[in-house]
A protein has these predicted regions:
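Conserved positions within tetratricopeptide repeat
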Residues: 318-325, 387, 490-493, 497, ...
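Inter-helical turn/loop segments and adjacent helix faces that build the functional surface
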Residues: 308-319, 477-489, 543-550, 627-637
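Hydrophobic, structured segments
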Residues: 243, 247, 436, 482-486, ...
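Long, polar/charge-rich, low-hydrophobicity segments
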Residues: 333-339, 505-534, 541-722
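Inward-facing hydrophobic residues that define packing positions of alpha-helical scaffold repeats
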Residues: 305, 324, 328, 474, ...
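Extended hydrophobic/aromatic segments used for targeting, binding, or gating
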Residues: 85-89, 97, 270-299, 472-547
Length: 753
């Protein structure tokens, strides 16, 4: 019998499914920065599908915090804001709070930093943003003081709105003006996409900008930007840049040579312990740093100071040599060199002043009162000389107007203002005696610091690309010292080799042919970005040239093939349905920073400009040219030229912003001299071979020469290069030069140093 639906028994009313309450997921990350928030009252989420889907389902703004463990203001934000009960409660109730380690996701850091810099005129860390559930930026900034906190980020900063007020305002705006927020966020994203057109405006024509005059025109803005009062600094706080024009022209050296003394003599350098350079100075005279030390910065500085030393004289004396050895020792020793061979990421800005202290302070490990300084040195006369040398003053050497938060009252940051010869005249003693006193004082201060103080906390993440930077710097340094200091050379080359072996074993998936980004006890899930491939390939090529180890260039070749496959812009333009839509004219060569299927990434960028890091495209161009020569692979050379073409429009308009790519322009236009060293199987290399090594390792890297080392007929370089195979089969051990595709024995003028 048919039954009317109204006759059915009443159905139970099912309540809409409630989303589970937020819980802090920081313990699911292996990042030291994120793990630092495990006990935070904020219910931190990781940037994954779960967090993004929750934001969409609950229609909430995402609060995105991007930072890193060594960062001073990241720690203050965690204390002043994230630990504040009302701030934490509001974050959990009205937003989906997401935390990201910038060193694990540099792609996100770059995208959202571009936004904050465009809107606010400046950036920094922590990077704090409010995003739509589609990850489009609505509002952002850097450090915001917590409720009741009065911390300033600089002497001229005025007290502004605190973090709690910002949270309340953003909650209200989203509740009352969501359509407007979404529309403005889409407009902002459109503008960011236009900005991201870098590297998509070039043509596939012959490289028109390969006129060498471009390199000289690029030095004029560099020269005008260098302050004569504070060399190396511009109009604002000083930032260490390693991509100045050392690789381009000797002329540029005159513009930047004045930078070296104030940087290595300033407050950024650890004068007592030789433990690297702090990341940047908050004053234009390089006197007051933020004390975090990043592996990437110090690796790049090692390469820069190595070039400066080689250009100046290459002798085993002088401050430049001391800086080179200090930095190389810093990397090839604990704690930066970790068990197993990888290099740690950073040392924190904040530390305990003495063992047993309960609160950390910025720079505490590196600061000295005059009273403690004198007591440690002991001898009054020697203490006076050392204090004069390092500018250690009775009431501290940080001016009150440069210390808005009173962190450095009566404290001294060692820095050198006078030459030792000048101090010798002041005290009526010889320069040699001054040097002896300084060395003695340094040893006493270092020993005291090691006993009484706690070294800043280490971020022991091993980053594949940053390890590539260190491998490159140590390989070049070890090679340069091969004749001058064999023991140091072996130490540095050994550390570089061990790191390369570690990265291959732990971060390279041989089956997938994929490089991963981070190792910390175990391999992380994040795959490497284009910059990681570029930096690691460069390090391996440098290590091959320094050691002749075939597995280095073989691994570099594997990585290069994968980088091209994953990141090179060789496909047709993607459609608007793609997760990462691109401008219609985007398919014109060069490397994207991310893969096409990168998740939770609103833009796919190509970087050509050098920043605090060398651009991945500039390094990749150099790698392609070098591998193209060593492995006789024309495809690599063609892709290098095509990558240069992709940035043609920008380079022609602003050449001084692209020093790394300009080096590629020079290589493309002039080529380079290639040296072939065929080793004697008996190990009895002749004098010419020795002179080739001395010449090439004793020169600053200029991108205009290549070195191929042959140990036997089965070498990869021989198998890939028929002409080289013929030379090995018919020639004798020794040194050769390639000219117009032909080999000839090195003449005297080829190896003159």
């Amino acid at each position: 019998m048919a039954t009317n639906s109204t006759d059915l028994p009443p159905q139970p009313v099912v309540a809409p499914e409630l989303a589970p309450s937020l819980r802090n997921r920081a313990d699911q990350s292996n990042s030291p920065y994120i793990q630092g928030q495990i006990n935070s009252p904020v219910a931190w989420q990781l940037l994954d599908d779960e967090a993004v889907e929750r934001a969409k389902r609950e229609n909430k703004l995402i609060f995105l915090n991007i930072g890193f463990k060594a960062c001073h203001y990241c720690r203050l934000t965690a204390i002043d804001s994230f630990s504040h009960p009302e701030c934490a409660s509001l974050l959990n109730e009205a937003f989906v709070p997401v935390i990201v380690d910038r060193e694990e996701r540099p792609d996100l850091d770059t995208i959202y930093m571009n936004y904050v810099q465009a809107v606010n005129g400046a950036g920094g860390w922590p990077l704090n943003l409010f995003l739509t559930p589609e990850l489009e930026p609505v509002f952002g900034g850097t450090y915001w003081p917590g409720p009741g906190a009065h911390t300033k980020t600089g002497p001229e900063e005025e007290e502004g709105v605190d973090f709690l007020a910002i949270l309340k305002n953003l909650r209200k705006v989203w509740q009352e003006q969501e359509p407007r927020c979404r529309q403005e966020a889409k407009e902002v994203l459109s503008k960011l996409r236009e900005f991201a057109a870098e590297g998509t405006l070039g043509t596939r024509s012959t490289v028109q900008m390969s006129k060498i005059g471009l390199t000289s025109s690029s030095t004029a803005p560099v020269a005008s930007a260098v302050s004569t009062e504070n060399p190396g600094a511009g109009k604002t706080a000083a930032d260490v840049s390693s991509e100045l024009d050392l690789d381009q022209l000797e002329e540029a050296y005159s513009h930047i040579a004045g930078t070296f003394d104030p940087v290595y003599g300033g407050g950024l350098r650890d004068h007592v312990g030789g433990c690297g350079f702090a990341r940047y100075s908050i004053t234009p005279d390089w006197s007051i740093p933020h004390f975090e030390k990043l592996t990437s910065d110090n690796a790049l500085l090692l390469g820069l100071y190595l070039d400066a030393w080689l250009i100046s004289n290459g002798d085993k004396d002088g401050e430049l040599y001391d800086v080179v050895v200090e930095l190389a020792d810093y990397f090839s020793s604990p704690p930066m060199r970790l068990p197993g061979g990888g290099f740690a990421s950073s040392e924190a800005a904040d530390s305990y002043y003495r063992r047993g202290d309960t609160d950390v302070r910025e720079g505490a490990f590196h600061l000295w009162t005059r009273k403690e300084f004198d007591a440690v040195i002991g001898d009054e006369h020697e203490a006076t000389i050392a204090a004069t040398y390092w500018n250690i003053l009775e009431h501290g050497n940080v001016e009150p107007d440069q210390d808005p938060n009173d962190e450095f009252m009566n404290q001294n940051i060692p820095r050198v203002l006078k030459e030792q010869s000048e101090i010798g005249k002041q005290f009526g003693i010889s320069g040699e005696e001054v040097a002896r006193v300084i060395a003695s004082a340094k040893a006493k201060l270092k020993a005291h610091r090691g006993r009484e103080r706690v070294r800043p906390e280490l971020d022991d993440k091993i980053i594949s690309g940053w390890n590539g930077l260190v491998i490159s710097a140590l390989a070049r340094t070890g090679a340069a010292l091969a004749v001058k200091d064999a023991a140091k050379s072996a130490q540095y080359l050994g550390a570089a080799i061990q790191s390369a072996e570690f990265v291959r074993a732990q971060l390279w998936d041989e089956k997938e042919k994929t490089l991963y980004k981070v190792f910390r006890g175990t391999r992380g899930s994040t795959k490497a970005f284009a910059e990681d491939y570029a930096y690691l390939i460069e390090g391996l090529i440098d290590l091959y040239e320094a050691t002749g180890e075939e597995n280095c260039i073989a691994f570099a070749d594997e990585l290069q093939q994968t980088q091209i496959k994953l990141f090179y812009d060789a496909s047709a333009p993607t459609t608007s349905a793609s997760p990462n839509p691109l401008p219609a004219h985007s398919s014109c060569g060069a490397f994207f920073a991310t893969t096409e299927d990168a998740k939770h990434t609103i833009l796919r960028l190509k970087d050509g400009m050098d920043t605090a890091f060398p651009s991945n495209n500039a390094v990749s161009v150099s790698n392609l040219f070098r591998l193209g020569v060593a492995l006789a692979t024309e495809t690599y050379t063609a892709l290098a030229r095509e990558t240069l073409n992709a940035f043609e429009a920008e380079i022609l308009q602003y050449p001084w912003l692209f020093p790394g790519l300009l080096s590629g322009v020079v290589s493309s236009r002039l080529g380079g001299r290639t040296y072939i060293v065929v080793r004697d199987p008996s190990g009895a290399d002749d004098e010419t071979v020795r002179k080739v090594f001395i010449k090439l390792y004793g020169e600053a890297r200029g991108g205009l020469r290549n070195l191929i080392i042959v140990k036997g007929p089965d070498d990869l370089v021989v198998r890939r290069n028929p002409a080289l195979a013929e030379l090995v089969a018919t020639g004798k051990p020794g040194a050769y030069v390639v000219e117009e595709g032909k080999f000839r024995p090195c003449a005297k003028e080829d190896v003159e140093y």
